[in-house]
Amino acid sequence: MIKFTLQGEFIPLIQLLKAVDLVGSGGEAQMVVQDGLVKYNGEVDYRKRLKVKKGDKVEFNGTTVNII
């Protein structure tokens, strides 16, 4: 599990995936979201520009990211 400390009100989902090094590029982040490989608060979510906020949980490739 990764704990990500949010700076500001939110972070777009694709930027979060890059920030915690779960993907190598923005293009890769967009592809994994589009392919339904990312879960947001336990549900598959296809929104690339999803605003992830404090208290949210993102899961990808066996790794969970808790937003604090």
Where are these regions (language model features)?
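A basic, amphipathic helix-loop patch mediating RNA/tRNA/ribosome contacts
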Residues: 11-54
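Short, Lys/Arg- and Gly-enriched loop/turn segments at beta-strand edges
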Residues: 64-68
